[in-house]
């Protein structure tokens, strides 16, 4: 994802990420738990969102860090350092390139309802851009470590967790329903429909039930493979 205005990318400047980019990230993180209702819509989605699989489980962000939820990819920050890395024989200074930087929201998978997900991300990002405290929120949720490393357990314990099932995702969507319905962007019936569908899976303790049961997991994956 990137922020553009007047056909110009506003994610970075010559120093690094802009304040508006950090605010945008803070907004997404603020609604990340309920955004899974649109981005992770089947029970097997939550079998992926577990520690130590380069998949996010906690609400945080960072640079080139595969343990975080919102990731800033390497390459276009701080005067395009990646170009020098890829071309070590390059002698001349690389000109600053402002138009390439993106950020990744790493929770969604192939089950995502892409239209509702993108609408939700835009609303969340807008909230972050407009909120007065969003830079502080971004600062508090930034990590530059592997949060799943045992030596960083103290930091891990300060972070909010993503839901672990469709059922719990629906709970977060219900909690944030007023936010999504504001200004009529998401009709009430749309939110209620997502909640009803997600809770109907009745998968609240599915991960615990399937732990180390490879055949049952395979059967479930096969069942939901073509769900969309």
Predicted features and spans:
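Acidic, glycine-enriched catalytic cores built around paired aspartates
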Residues: 139-228
